[in-house]
């Protein structure tokens, strides 16, 4: 790749080697006045990741300064994400970087996608239909399963694909989508990197800005750290699902996923969730544990969130909504709000109790 493409795809091995050859240590990357634009861009791409989309510039091959800024902003953004070391941020960042690459890959020539796939140790053979001249790729089914398994659309299921002699035929855009998944996994699994404490301290002006945006986004998504699981504060849909499980009702797959991912996200352990399904009529502990560990990200590092309220309604899983349901968009948002209200009331009561004690007449 030329330097312009390395800047657009900074996660490839060649880009890492090129940056290493420039001799920019983390300390120099942080302190050099000449690299201020790279630091600003590095912070910007993390904030853009929180918003869901990293905007990639398109510098010409002659704009060496802009190319270097974009190229060096990537390792600096990784430093910032690592210093904050928040799983939610790491997942959002990796996904946004991968999505940005996907949009670019769709415009590239087939040979470029083939070369990029090779960097991920994926053998994608180019095939041209002799009659229509359409371009396809042949991908070994093991590579296909590895990359397509997290994708939810039924079209990605192996049983719905054409396979010949162990190879799956896919379109150029489909290969770009699978490469997006490979990119996401590479970035997510490589974070956090080890960053010296003094470097993280020097990054505080940048990480504070990102952390502020991170907390806003967590509130929006209903993501937070819960001190303990409070079942009396669950949204009606989850309460009903748990009641059905305890009554021996076999939940639909979509509701089972929603309930499991909700419980994992509020802090229940895999063992605790497995125990809840122990009464289910089709209970298979090994299979159940595998499914729950997958949702919890035990092996992949990706913890799945429960579906939004709109999706719950679409699948018929929204049951007995109450007044609070009208003001939230996500089951985790419902739970977060009720936890916040309960904590606020407890704090107010404790404060009032202290004030009352101070105003009491001491015994005579």
From Swiss-Prot:
SUBUNIT field: Heterodimer of a small subunit (PriS) and a large subunit (PriL).
A single MF term (Gene Ontology): DNA-directed RNA polymerase activity
One cellular component term from this protein's GO annotations in UniProt: primosome complex
Protein name (record): DNA primase large subunit PriL
Record gene name: priL
Keywords: 4Fe-4S, DNA replication, Iron, Iron-sulfur, Metal-binding, Primosome
NCBIfam families, per database record: PRK02249.1-2
Entry cofactors: [4Fe-4S] cluster
């Amino acid at each position: 790749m030329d330097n312009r493409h390395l800047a657009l795809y900074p996660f490839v091995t060649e880009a890492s080697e090129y940056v290493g050859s420039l001799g920019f240590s983390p300390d120099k990357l942080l302190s050099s006045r000449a690299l201020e634009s790279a630091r600003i861009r590095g912070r910007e791409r993390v904030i853009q990741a929180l918003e869901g989309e990293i905007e990639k510039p398109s510098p010409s091959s002659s704009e060496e300064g802009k190319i270097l800024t974009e190229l060096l902003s990537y390792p600096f953004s990784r430093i910032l994400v690592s210093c904050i070391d928040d799983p939610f941020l790491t997942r959002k960042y990796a996904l946004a970087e991968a999505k940005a690459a996907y949009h670019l890959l769709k415009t590239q020539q087939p040979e470029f996608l083939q070369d990029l796939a090779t960097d991920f140790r994926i053998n994608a053979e180019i095939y041209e239909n002799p009659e229509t001249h359409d371009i396809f790729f042949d991908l070994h089914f093991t590579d296909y399963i590895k990359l397509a398994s997290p994708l939810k659309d039924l079209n990605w299921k192996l049983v719905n694909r054409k396979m010949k002699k162990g190879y799956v035929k896919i379109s150029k855009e489909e290969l770009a989508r699978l490469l997006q998944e490979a990119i996401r996994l590479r970035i997510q699994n490589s974070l956090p990197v080890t960053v010296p404490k003094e470097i993280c301290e020097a990054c505080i002006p940048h990480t504070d800005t990102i952390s502020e945006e991170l907390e806003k986004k967590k509130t929006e998504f209903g993501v937070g750290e819960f001190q303990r699981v409070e079942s009396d504060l669950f949204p009606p849909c989850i309460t009903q699902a748990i009641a059905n499980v305890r009554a021996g009702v076999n939940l639909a797959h979509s509701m089972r996923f929603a309930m499991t991912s909700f419980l994992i996200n509020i802090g229940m352990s895999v063992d605790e969730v497995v125990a809840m399904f122990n009464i289910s009529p089709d209970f298979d502990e090994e299979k159940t544990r595998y499914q729950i560990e997958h949702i919890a990200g035990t092996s992949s590092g990706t913890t799945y969130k429960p579906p939004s309220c709109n999706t719950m309604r679409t699948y018929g899983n929204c049951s007995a909504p109450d007044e609070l349901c009208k003001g939230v968009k996500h089951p985790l948002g419902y739970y977060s709000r009720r936890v916040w209200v309960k904590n606020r009331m407890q704090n107010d009561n404790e404060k009032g109790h202290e004030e009352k004690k101070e105003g009491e007449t001491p015994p005579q």
